[in-house]
């Protein structure tokens, strides 16, 4: 078994087994994300700077986002991550994907779409305990303007 760990706690580590390897990160469930070098490289790059990830369907853009999110939530314990998706169904899909692999309680995750009334949206934005928000761009724009 080869255990690769970076000096900085912000970096993703992985455990290499003869038949498979998995991402090891305190906020990611054990053996829930298989390690892929290209995803790890993109995630490490995206952690330090703005990054546009363009990959064909089913090559793991969501996994890269989960890896970056896990590191941000772990290293910045009083901050929140905003995940923006163009449609409500995609917001819900991302929320389910993140929740299935991240060790984060459901009360720390929120969804804000056009179906969320204004008062609950304000409560979500003001709730410091919510660490992960999934929203559509229109709602974010409208709430910033109000």
Model feature map: region roles:
Residues 1-146:
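N-terminal helicase ATP-binding lobe
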């Amino acid at each position: 078994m080869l255990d690769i760990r970076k000096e900085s706690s912000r970096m993703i580590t992985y455990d290499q087994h003869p038949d498979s390897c998995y991402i090891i990160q305190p906020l990611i469930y054990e053996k829930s994300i298989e390690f892929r070098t290209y995803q790890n490289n993109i995630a490490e790059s995206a952690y330090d700077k703005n990054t546009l990830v363009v990959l064909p369907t089913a090559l793991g853009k969501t996994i890269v986002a989960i890896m970056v999110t896990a590191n941000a939530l772990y290293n910045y314990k009083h901050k929140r991550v905003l995940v923006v998706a163009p449609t409500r169904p995609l917001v819900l899909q991302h929320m389910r994907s993140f929740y299935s692999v991240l060790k984060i309680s459901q009360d720390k995750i929120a969804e804000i779409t056009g179906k969320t009334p204004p008062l609950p949206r304000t409560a979500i934005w003001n709730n410091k305990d919510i660490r992960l928000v999934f929203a559509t761009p229109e709602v974010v724009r409208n709430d910033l303007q109000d």
